[in-house]
Amino acid sequence: MALQAATTTSFLPSALSARKEGAVKDSAFLGVRLGDGLKLETSALGLRTKRVSTSSVAIRAQASAAVSSPTVTPASPSGKQTLRKGTAVITGASSGLGLATAKALAETGRWHVVMGCRDFLKASRAAKAAGMEKGSYTIVHLDLASLDSVRQFVANVRRLEMPVDVVVCNAAVYQPTAKQPSFTADGFEMSVGVNHLGHFLLARELLADLTSSDYPSKRLIIVGSITGNTNTLAGNVPPKANLGDLRGLASGLDGVSSSAMIDGGEFDGAKAYKDSKVCNMLTMQEFHRRYHGETGVTFASLYPGCIATTGLFREHVPLFRLLFPPFQKYITKGYVSEEEAGKRLAQVVSDPSLTKSGVYWSWNNNSASFENQLSEEASDPEKAKKVWELSEKLVGLADHDQ
């Protein structure tokens, strides 16, 4: 999808006007360019919409593309160049690592960022506060806790008529102090449902778009975590990641007919997050094995360093939030700022030297990237295949033809 609009296109979440049941599918707000495709009305009862003809939308978008000044992107390893900006889709881009990455890419002038976020207003304010220029980003509603929302997000991204050159699966939930599991709209334990299953469906659906892109270096990046990698010190802090025989995942993780944990054990919020990150890293490798040779897409994962001040830790106990940043800064030396972590992820998105597929990237203290080793479980091809097949069934892709 060639970049066609010089101005920011924003999408409002379906929750503004739709009832809870069928909200994502039926909302008139999703997938229509505001100001062109919608007339908004307010009343004492809330916000209503009227759809108008979209033919003028396409005309104006095409006219905008015609006068836009193309930007030459860096040469690929083969020496090719493309006379357009790259388009990167980033989930969880309204804060933390996602926002920092979106900013780092947008600042180059060579990337347009599609920000997949649950809260439109939060994302809009965050982009403005970060100094991102209008026209460098598009906000599209995405709730990874709903598979319907994921599918609607994919449909709305396609309506933008931009290419999909890079997909970054970044968003995550972390509930380390939870005593009881919470669940997604589809009945999955929240951490695995959002961090793994939501992203699994998103990546599978957008793979065709990545494949059809003419960008010199197409990439799918899934953010990993050192906490799910048990060959590291951090990965051995209890509770350790362990997917076991996948009996919980095979049974649906609903906490009723099956355990809410992948290994079938008792619920533990911290372990659920770590297990989801193992699934992320296994999924990246399975994507590489199945599709890299056929599509030319680079599949990679990374751990950008410990962002000890990130909002990901907002549900931790106050004492942890107080002591964790200085501990990482002065004891482990693993601390990185959100800004630096964003630059590292942006490097994996765009650096011509980081095109190797199937790699888990990390950084030394001197900010030099290197290929890191994954734990035995996180690099087990048989377990990756099993996680893939079970995940297909859970998200409704078991009979899906690629």
From Swiss-Prot:
Q: What does this protein do?
A: Phototransformation of protochlorophyllide (Pchlide) to chlorophyllide (Chlide).
GO cellular component, alphabetical, reads: chloroplast
Reactions this protein catalyses: chlorophyllide a + NADP(+) = protochlorophyllide a + NADPH + H(+)
From what superkingdom does this record's organism come?
A: Eukaryota
InterPro entries from the UniProt entry: NAD(P)-bd_dom_sf, Prochl_reduct, SDR_fam
Q: What is this protein called?
A: Protochlorophyllide reductase B, chloroplastic
- Which PANTHER family does this entry report, sorted A to Z? PROTOCHLOROPHYLLIDE REDUCTASE C, CHLOROPLASTIC
Keywords from the UniProt entry:
Chlorophyll biosynthesis, Chloroplast, NADP, Oxidoreductase, Photosynthesis, Plastid, Transit peptide
